[in-house]
């Protein structure tokens, strides 16, 4: 992904993390609470099999839609 899209995507990931603070369900592996920023980044990496920086530019819109899905469906 080019630097401009990568920067935009990182900002969207941060905003999604801000939105999800306190919304993720409790988990026994995270007794002090879950990190919503890491959650979004890990979900993106898992779905697209690459770090957000390494996803092709052609998939930018798809990644943004997926992040919106994560915000609407905290898990």
What are these regions (language model features)?
Residues 1-75:
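Positively charged, phosphate-engaging catalytic surfaces used for nucleic-acid and nucleotide handling
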């Amino acid at each position: 992904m080019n630097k401009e899209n990568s920067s935009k995507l990182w900002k969207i990931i941060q905003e999604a993390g801000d939105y999800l603070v306190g919304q993720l369900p409790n988990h026994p592996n995270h007794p002090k609470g879950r990190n919503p920023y890491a959650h979004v980044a890990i979900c993106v990496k898992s779905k697209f099999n690459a770090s957000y920086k390494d996803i092709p530019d052609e998939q930018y819109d798809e990644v943004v839609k997926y992040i919106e899905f994560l915000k609407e469906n905290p898990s």
